[in-house]
């Protein structure tokens, strides 16, 4: 037998790629994500997400509830940005009812939508940084996040699942002192953001882990159906607050930050700059907010005040009927969407003329973003998968529903 010739008795086989599970118990999975990774050494060849571990049948449950009873389900979808989802649902019901929300209520809704955006981006940026190895931003910004939770609690009584934005307006007006406290927060939080930027923006390790990782071109972003930060990070200036304004956004002056490289670092910067813009929007709203009603003056849609119920039998009856039977919505169908912190959150409602929705389809931005995890991770190291999951800012409440 020649020197370099392989013996016919030796069996040769090609080395297969190594397959491993990532999650669902992994701390960097941000919930119940199960990834099946196909690895070629340290490089990712395929990432297959397995979802459904947090499925609760929300859309079906809503069909068995009145329009008011269905509202709290929306807080429990993306449980990091609660009021944004209530907002989309309320807009859809108001379209079907053809009712106009009072201007003060619109300003309050915008203030709380932007506070929710900050609430979400604080969690997104700090947990992303912590996944990569930076603990300090988490400790700094969660102190600020606690203040935002207090603002939630002061208007609704709940720190997370507020059920504050309701069809026809908001649950109650600002309590005494809240206006001043939000204004003070806006002034102080600006400088805390500056400190976080000083810590991360030029940090060598942070940039090594994020720059040129998870690049998505503008064409890819559109074909995947991206929205929100994931779309703007690829250089497309699309924001529903500008492109399809709702409430009082058309009366406000603010900028839309967009990226140019479509990588994780660009998306991090956009989230930080969006927090600056949210502070600017909140300040404008607090200054321009007029006095007036905070819910539609129609007792068939919104409940009467507690003080009225003590003296008026009619108000008591309205209140009882509203919470026991709800209100009938004219037979029709509509789609309403808001620029939620994670992207376009939409609600498609079909009414059959009864007091319960015939169908309620929820469009969650995170579902579309997670689909692209395979293409974004391909060719990267296994450690970069953690960075990409962090930059997608996914929450499984809305993905699994």
Swiss-Prot record:
One of its GO terms (cellular component) is mitochondrion. It is an enzyme of class 7 (translocase). One of its GO terms (molecular function) is quinone binding. Pfam families: Complex1_49kDa (PF00346). The keyword Electron transport applies. Keywords: Electron transport, Mitochondrion, NAD, Oxidoreductase, Respiratory chain, Translocase, Transport, Ubiquinone. Its main location: mitochondrion. Gene3D superfamilies: Cytochrome-c3 Hydrogenase, chain B. InterPro entries: NADH_Q_OxRdtase_suD, NADH_UbQ_OxRdtase_49kDa_CS, NDH1_su_D/H, NiFe-Hase_large. One of its GO terms (biological process) is mitochondrial electron transport, NADH to ubiquinone. It is found in: Mitochondrion. Its EC number is 7.1.1.2. Signal peptide: none annotated. The keyword Transport applies. It catalyses: a ubiquinone + NADH + 5 H(+)(in) = a ubiquinol + NAD(+) + 4 H(+)(out). Core subunit of the mitochondrial membrane respiratory chain NADH dehydrogenase (Complex I) that is believed to belong to the minimal assembly required for catalysis. Complex I functions in the transfer of electrons from NADH to the respiratory chain. The immediate electron acceptor for the enzyme is believed to be ubiquinone. Component of the iron-sulfur (IP) fragment of the enzyme. Belongs to the complex I 49 kDa subunit family. This is NADH-ubiquinone oxidoreductase 49 kDa subunit.
């Amino acid at each position: 037998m020649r020197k370099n010739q392989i013996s016919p008795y030796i069996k040769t086989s090609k080395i297969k790629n190594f397959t491993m599970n990532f999650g669902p118990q992994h701390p960097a999975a941000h919930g119940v994500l199960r990834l099946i990774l196909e690895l070629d050494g340290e490089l990712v060849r395929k990432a297959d997400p397995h979802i459904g571990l947090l499925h609760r049948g929300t859309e079906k449950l809503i069909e068995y509830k009145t329009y008011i009873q269905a509202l709290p389900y929306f807080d429990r979808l993306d449980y990091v940005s609660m009021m944004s989802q209530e907002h989309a649902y309320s807009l859809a019901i108001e379209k079907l009812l053809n009712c106009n929300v009072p201007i003060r209520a619109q300003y309050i809704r915008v203030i709380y939508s932007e506070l929710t955006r900050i609430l979400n981006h604080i969690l997104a940026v700090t947990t992303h940084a912590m996944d990569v190895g930076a603990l300090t931003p988490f400790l700094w910004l969660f102190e600020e996040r606690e203040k935002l939770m207090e603002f939630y609690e002061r208007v609704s009584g709940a720190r997370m699942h507020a059920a504050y934005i309701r069809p026809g307006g908001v649950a109650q007006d600002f309590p005494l002192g809240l206006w001043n406290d939000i204004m003070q927060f806006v002034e102080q939080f600006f400088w805390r953001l500056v400190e976080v930027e000083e810590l991360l923006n030029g940090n060598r390790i942070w940039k090594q882990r994020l720059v040129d990782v998870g690049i998505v071109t503008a064409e890819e972003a559109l074909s995947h159906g991206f929205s929100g930060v994931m779309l703007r990070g690829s250089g497309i200036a699309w924001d529903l607050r500008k492109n399809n304004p709702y409430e009082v956004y058309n009366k406000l002056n603010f900028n839309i930050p967009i990226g140019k490289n479509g990588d994780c670092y660009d998306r991090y910067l956009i989230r930080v700059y969006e927090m600056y813009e949210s502070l600017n929007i909140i300040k404008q709203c607090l200054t321009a907010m007029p006095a007036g009603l905070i819910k539609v003056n129609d007792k068939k849609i919104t409940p009467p005040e507690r003080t009225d119920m003590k003296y008026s039998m009619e108000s008591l009856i309205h209140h009882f009927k509203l919470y026991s039977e709800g209100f009938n919505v004219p037979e029709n169908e509509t789609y309403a969407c808001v620029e939620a912190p994670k992207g376009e959150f939409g609600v498609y409602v079909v009414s059959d003329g009864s007091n319960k929705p015939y169908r309620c389809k929820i469009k969650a931005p995170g579902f579309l973003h997670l689909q692209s995890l395979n293409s974004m991770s391909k060719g990267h190291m296994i450690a970069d998968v953690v960075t990409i999951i962090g930059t997608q800012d996914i929450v499984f409440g809305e993905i699994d529903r």
